[in-house]
């Protein structure tokens, strides 16, 4: 049986004194405070950048909403104008039908050029309305009115400490809290503007479908009138 000598027995581990333990705890607390302060500064910088980004989002959303509202008005005008054009073409078609009994009259040779001009002019009018009126929205006045939505958006959290739990209770945390409140209000404004844009798009979708149908009807009527004119001129 093996025997251990006294020399082979390890020395007992010396436990730190109470003073040493307190110093180590204090050192760790100091390091933790420094880490918290560092993270707070980083969070503050991030919140400032978020405010800038959300402000730009609001500006873009306001401009887009204003453009959609202006586009909605122009779509109404285009739809009304197309309906009037089709009504006028139907009248022309009816009159040509009534004149078919006078085939061979020189009057129809005079009619040919104005009718071609009328068809070309009608397409130009629609093209000008789409290109000019839709690309020049009245943004400034609508932007100013819509910006009030951003400044007066619902303040869901107004009391201190609702967004973050205070650790240092210093000026950095105060500013960070204010920034978070501003971010919350900005996001609320963006959400409201997004809803407005969605509503506008939903309202305009059936109008675009009706305009497409009116355009097809217009082409059909013009083709029919052209056929009648060709028969009369030959």
Swiss-Prot record:
<comment type="function">
    <text>t-SNARE protein which regulates the secretion of aex-5 from intestinal cells. Involved in the defecation motor program, which is a coordinated series of three muscle contractions that occurs every 45 seconds.</text>
</comment>
<dbReference type="GO" id="GO:0050714">
    <property type="term" value="P:positive regulation of protein secretion"/>
</dbReference>
<feature type="domain" description="t-SNARE coiled-coil homology 2">
    <location>
        <begin position="170"/>
        <end position="232"/>
    </location>
</feature>
<comment type="similarity">
    <text>Belongs to the SNAP-25 family.</text>
</comment>
<dbReference type="GO" id="GO:0019905">
    <property type="term" value="F:syntaxin binding"/>
</dbReference>
<feature type="domain" description="t-SNARE coiled-coil homology 1">
    <location>
        <begin position="37"/>
        <end position="99"/>
    </location>
</feature>
<dbReference type="GO" id="GO:2000294">
    <property type="term" value="P:positive regulation of defecation"/>
</dbReference>
<keyword id="KW-1003">Cell membrane</keyword>
<dbReference type="GO" id="GO:0005886">
    <property type="term" value="C:plasma membrane"/>
</dbReference>
<dbReference type="GO" id="GO:0031629">
    <property type="term" value="P:synaptic vesicle fusion to presynaptic active zone membrane"/>
</dbReference>
<dbReference type="GO" id="GO:2000292">
    <property type="term" value="P:regulation of defecation"/>
</dbReference>
<dbReference type="GO" id="GO:0098793">
    <property type="term" value="C:presynapse"/>
</dbReference>
<dbReference type="GO" id="GO:0031201">
    <property type="term" value="C:SNARE complex"/>
</dbReference>
<keyword id="KW-0175">Coiled coil</keyword>
<keyword id="KW-0472">Membrane</keyword>
<dbReference type="GO" id="GO:0006887">
    <property type="term" value="P:exocytosis"/>
</dbReference>
<protein>
    <recommendedName>
        <fullName>t-SNARE protein aex-4</fullName>
    </recommendedName>
</protein>
<dbReference type="GO" id="GO:0016082">
    <property type="term" value="P:synaptic vesicle priming"/>
</dbReference>
<dbReference type="InterPro" id="IPR000727">
    <property type="entry name" value="T_SNARE_dom"/>
</dbReference>
<dbReference type="GO" id="GO:0005484">
    <property type="term" value="F:SNAP receptor activity"/>
</dbReference>
<keyword id="KW-0677">Repeat</keyword>
């Amino acid at each position: 049986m093996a025997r251990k000598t006294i020399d082979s027995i390890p020395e007992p581990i010396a436990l730190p004194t109470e003073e040493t333990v307190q110093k180590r705890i204090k050192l760790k607390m100091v390091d933790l405070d420094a880490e918290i302060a560092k993270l707070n500064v980083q969070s503050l910088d991030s919140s400032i950048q978020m405010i800038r980004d959300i402000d730009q989002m609001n500006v873009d959303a306001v401009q887009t909403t204003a453009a959609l509202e202006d586009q909605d008005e122009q779509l109404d005008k285009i739809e009304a104008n197309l309906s009037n054009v089709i009504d006028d073409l139907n009248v022309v078609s009816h009159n040509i039908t009534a004149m078919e009994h006078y085939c061979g009259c020189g009057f129809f040779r005079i009619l040919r050029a104005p009718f071609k001009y009328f068809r070309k002019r009608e397409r130009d009018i629609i093209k000008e309305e789409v290109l000019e009126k839709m690309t020049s929205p009245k943004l400034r006045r609508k932007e100013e009115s819509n910006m009030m939505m951003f400044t007066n958006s619902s303040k869901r959290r107004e009391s201190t400490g609702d967004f973050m739990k205070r650790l240092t209770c210093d000026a950095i945390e105060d500013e960070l809290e204010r920034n978070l409140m501003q971010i919350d209000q900005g996001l609320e404004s963006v959400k409201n503007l997004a809803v407005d844009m969605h509503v506008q798009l939903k309202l305009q979708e059936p109008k675009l479908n009706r305009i497409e149908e009116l355009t097809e009807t217009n082409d059909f009527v013009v083709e029919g009138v052209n056929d009648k004119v060709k028969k009369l001129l030959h």
